[in-house]
Amino acid sequence: MHNIFKGLITAAITPFKDNTLDLDALEKILEHQIKYEVDGVLIAGSTGECSNLSFEEYKLLLQTSLEIVNKRIPIISGCSSNNTAYARELAAESTKIGVDGFMASPPSYIKPTQEGIYKHFEALHEACNIPIMLYSAPTRSGVDFSDETILRLSKLSRILALKDCGVDLERPMRIRTIVKEDFNLLTGNDEVVLAFNAQGGVGWVSVASNIVPNICKELLEKWYKNDVKEALEIHQRLLPLYKALFVESNPIPIKYAAHYLGLCANKIRLPLTEASYKTKKQIENIITSLSIKI
C-alpha cells in the first residue's frame, strides 16, 4: 500500500459562515494549498474543529473537499473519537466517500489502557481499506501510545505512519529503530519540525501552512536537499508565527490569521471563542513583518 503520509501536510481549518459550513471559503483555502503543491491536506482534524462538526457536516466537508481537489493532492480525514463505534463509523464513511487516508488519536477523556488503545485502532483498521496515520496528541487526549503499542500497531497492514505532536525529540529515533522502514514519522509541532526530522522524521503536519504553505514547503525542500543553513534561516524566521499560533487554543489564532488574509470569516464554534484583541494584534504584526499575502 502506497504511503501518502510524508512531506508537508496542512492541517486545514474549517470555514464557517453564520452557523453553517462556508464551502466557497473552503475552495479558496484548498486552492491556496494546491497552488503551492503541499503533499496533502488533513480535513476535520483538531485544527479543523472536528469535535464541533455534526456527522452530516463531516460528510459534506469531506465530499466537497474531494470535489474541489479532484485528485490533485491527497485528502486525509480526521477520525478521532472517544467512542470506538463512532470512530469506526467515521472511518467507514471516510472510506466510502473516497478520501486517500485517515488519521485518529487515542480516545480522549476516558484514558484507556495500552491494550484498549490497541483494540480501538484494531477496530478502525478492520473498518476500512485505506491508509491510517496514528495521531499522538497527549495534551488533547490525556493518554498516549507507548513505544510498544506503536510497534504493535505498525504491524497492522494499513497503519503506515505516526503524527507526533510531542516535544520528546528522542522518541522519533526510538520509534525509528523498532518499526519497519516504510512506517513514516511526522511531526505535528511546527516549532520542532527540523529537530524532529533530524531524528528520523519524514514530514510535517502543519498549522502554520494554512497561511504560509509556500514558505513551509521551501523549508522542507531545503532540508531534504541538505541545505541545512537555509532551512534553519527559514525556520528561525517563522518561529514567531509558530509561537503566535498557539498563544490561545488552536485553531483560534490560525482562524483569525486566515480571516485577516481574506481566506475565510473569523467564525469559530463554542466552546472555542474568537481571538482576544491582544492575540489579533500579535498575529497582524507578524503577518506584516513576514510580508505574508494570499
From Swiss-Prot:
SMART domains reported in the protein's UniProt record: DHDPS
The keyword Transmembrane belongs to this UniProt entry's keyword annotation: no
Give residue numbers for the site Part of a proton relay during catalysis: S46, Y109
Q: What is its EC number?
A: 4.3.3.7
Q: Which GO terms describe its biological process?
A: diaminopimelate biosynthetic process; glyoxylate catabolic process; lysine biosynthetic process via diaminopimelate
Query: In the UniProt entry, which residues are flagged as the active site?
Result: Y135, K163
Gene3D superfamilies per UniProt = Aldolase class I
Q: Which UniProt keywords apply?
A: Amino-acid biosynthesis, Cytoplasm, Diaminopimelate biosynthesis, Lyase, Lysine biosynthesis, Schiff base
Quickly give the catalysed reaction.
L-aspartate 4-semialdehyde + pyruvate = (2S,4S)-4-hydroxy-2,3,4,5-tetrahydrodipicolinate + H2O + H(+)
Signal peptide residues on this chain, from the entry's feature table: none
Subcellular location as annotated:
Cytoplasm
Q: Where does pyruvate bind?
A: T47, V205
Q: In which pathway does it act?
A: Amino-acid biosynthesis; L-lysine biosynthesis via DAP pathway; (S)-tetrahydrodipicolinate from L-aspartate: step 3/4
Q: Name one Pfam family in it.
A: DHDPS
Q: Which InterPro entries match?
A: Aldolase_TIM, DapA, DapA-like, Schiff_base-form_aldolases_AS
- Gene Ontology, cellular component aspect: cytoplasm
Domain of life from the UniProt record: Bacteria
Q: Name one GO molecular function term.
A: 4-hydroxy-tetrahydrodipicolinate synthase activity
Report the sequence similarity comment from the record.
Belongs to the DapA family.
The record, for NCBIfam families, names: dapA (TIGR00674)
Which function does this protein serve?
Catalyzes the condensation of (S)-aspartate-beta-semialdehyde [(S)-ASA] and pyruvate to 4-hydroxy-tetrahydrodipicolinate (HTPA).
How does the record describe its quaternary structure? Homotetramer; dimer of dimers.
Q: What is this protein called?
A: 4-hydroxy-tetrahydrodipicolinate synthase
Source taxonomy: Bacteria, Pseudomonadati, Pseudomonadota, Alphaproteobacteria, Rickettsiales
**Name of encoding gene:** dapA
